[in-house]
Amino acid sequence: MSIKYVATSKLPTPWGVFAMHGFEDTESGKEHVALTFGTLSADEPVLGRIHSECLTGDALFSLRCDCGFQLQAAMQNIAETGSGFILYLRQEGRGIGLLNKIRAYELQDKGANTVEANEQLGFEADMRKYDMIKPMLEQIGVKHVRLMTNNPRKVKAMKEFGIEVVERVPLQVGKNRYNEAYLKTKSTELGHMMSEYHFMDENK
């Protein structure tokens, strides 16, 4: 994998003005983005998140997942902290792509869970790769991270690429009656670290 830095621009948001850094994977043609806020330290832990693209949750306000809620919460947390980053990776549908994600949703509408749906389509439960995070973090000057995630695979990926994860910061937001089963599957079958908050019934 060859990641090339392309350009940086300002990105005004409801939480403040971020910097948007564009990257291209010259082998696959995929385009990735790093958002940064404030001054990032190479010596001190920086609050950050690895976020995989989710068109339905991030842009279309879907309640089937917690992705959009997590993205907004991460941006707000970073702004309130005063500095931080988000690596926005173009890996829709845990790496299977948008149309296959819609096919998986169709199977879920018929009773399959999120893992079963992927497997019925001939995919692994999670097809995402994280090779691009090292050159992206090198470009923005981050070596030590307070990582906002519930996913142990992201913690492992950072450590494998020589990035110190000083702290895992839970990001448990967005539970609702449409995604309760999905969240439970992420916990029980994909190993995501979640508290009982996600399994209470107050929003039914």
UniProtKB/Swiss-Prot annotation:
Residues where Zn(2+) binds: C54, C65, C67
GO molecular function: GTP binding; GTP cyclohydrolase II activity; zinc ion binding
UniProt record, GO biological process: riboflavin biosynthetic process
TM ranges: none
Cofactor note: Binds 1 zinc ion per subunit.
Pathway connected to this protein: Cofactor biosynthesis; riboflavin biosynthesis; 5-amino-6-(D-ribitylamino)uracil from GTP: step 1/4
Pfam families: GTP_cyclohydro2 (PF00925)
Cofactor list: Zn(2+)
Enzyme class: hydrolase
Annotated catalysed reactions: GTP + 4 H2O = 2,5-diamino-6-hydroxy-4-(5-phosphoribosylamino)-pyrimidine + formate + 2 phosphate + 3 H(+)
Catalytic site positions: D126, R128
Keywords: GTP-binding, Hydrolase, Metal-binding, Nucleotide-binding, Riboflavin biosynthesis, Zinc
Source domain of life: Bacteria
EC number in record: 3.5.4.25
GO cellular component, one term: cytosol
Binding site for GTP: R49, I50, H51, S52, E53, Q70, E92, G93, R94, T114, T149, K154
SUPFAM superfamilies: RibA-like (SSF142695)
Family classification: Belongs to the GTP cyclohydrolase II family.
HAMAP family the record matches: RibA
Biological role: Catalyzes the conversion of GTP to 2,5-diamino-6-ribosylamino-4(3H)-pyrimidinone 5'-phosphate (DARP), formate and pyrophosphate.
Entries under PANTHER family matching the protein: 3,4-DIHYDROXY-2-BUTANONE 4-PHOSPHATE SYNTHASE (PTHR21327:SF18), GTP CYCLOHYDROLASE II-RELATED (PTHR21327)
Listed name of the protein: GTP cyclohydrolase-2
Native organism: Shewanella baltica (strain OS185)
